[in-house]
């Protein structure tokens, strides 16, 4: 691929929300082009008012739309020029890391090519044409679709986490993100307990307690696992280093 030009018209609804404009501009730009090496990307976005419910950030907020654009374009190009859609993706996938996108973001890790190849092996992609022809003789249509998703976290780039051991044998996991139904208390404890080789029921989960949690930037922007879990793993490394040292 040489370049991508995206001209977006985003439905803001009948009123302007706090996150609606950001979802179709800044958030979308972080994923525009997906996991493909596209040296030049130009994007414009125009918000329009309609007689519908106001749009605001929910899950992903702009990244699904950006990924859909490039993935759909690849399928259209493959059909028009008689390319295999998987081969076209593999030919243009990001292969050298770290990779700087056209918008200046750095992608430092990712197994993009390997993920596509594993998916192909898992579904027996080579045998798809035969399965499709068999279905056709029975009066059925069989289709197949591929899509890669590049996710970027938003929100403040600062996070905190602490692991504290008490004389009683209990362990406090203090986190700066906050769960309001997503199940952080289960996911985080599972991650930390397995990393330390300890039983999960030894942990007490602490959030939203300003007497105990010294630093945190909350949830939102798909940042809790990106930022919160990464910070916890740094704390895990500190615990192990102290225990070994």
For the regions a protein language model found, what residue spans apply to each?
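Helix N-cap / loop-to-helix initiation motif
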Residues: 81-89, 197-201
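Gly/Pro-rich active-site capping loops and adjacent beta-alpha segments
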Residues: 1-66, 136-245
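Accessory "access/gating" subregions that flank catalytic or transport cores
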Residues: 90-164
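Catalytic cofactor-binding cores of redox enzymes
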Residues: 85-87, 112, 240
């Amino acid at each position: 691929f040489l370049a991508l030009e995206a001209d977006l018209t985003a439905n803001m609804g009948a009123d302007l929300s706090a996150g609606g404009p950001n979802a179709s501009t800044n958030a979308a730009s972080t994923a525009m082009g997906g996991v493909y090496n596209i040296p030049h990307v130009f994007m414009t976005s125009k918000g329009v008012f309609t007689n519908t419910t106001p749009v605001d950030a929910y899950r992903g907020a702009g990244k699904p739309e950006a990924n859909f654009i490039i993935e759909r374009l690849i399928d259209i190009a493959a059909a028009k020029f008689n390319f295999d859609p998987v081969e076209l993706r593999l030919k243009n996938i990001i292969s050298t890391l770290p990779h700087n996108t056209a918008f200046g973001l750095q992608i430092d890790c990712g197994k993009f090519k390997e993920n596509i190849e594993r998916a192909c092996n898992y579904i027996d992609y080579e045998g798809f044409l035969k399965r499709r022809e068999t279905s056709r003789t029975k009066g059925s249509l069989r289709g197949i679709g591929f899509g890669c998703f590049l996710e970027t976290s938003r929100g403040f780039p600062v996070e905190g986490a602490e692991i504290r051991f008490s004389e009683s044998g209990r362990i406090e996991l203090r986190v700066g993100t906050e769960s309001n139904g997503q199940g952080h208390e289960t996911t985080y404890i599972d991650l930390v307990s397995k990393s330390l080789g300890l039983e999960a029921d030894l942990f007490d989960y602490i959030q939203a307690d300003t007497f105990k949690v010294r630093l945190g930037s909350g949830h939102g922007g798909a940042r809790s696992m990106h930022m919160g879990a990464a910070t916890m793993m740094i704390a895990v490394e500190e615990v192990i280093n102290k225990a070994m040292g």
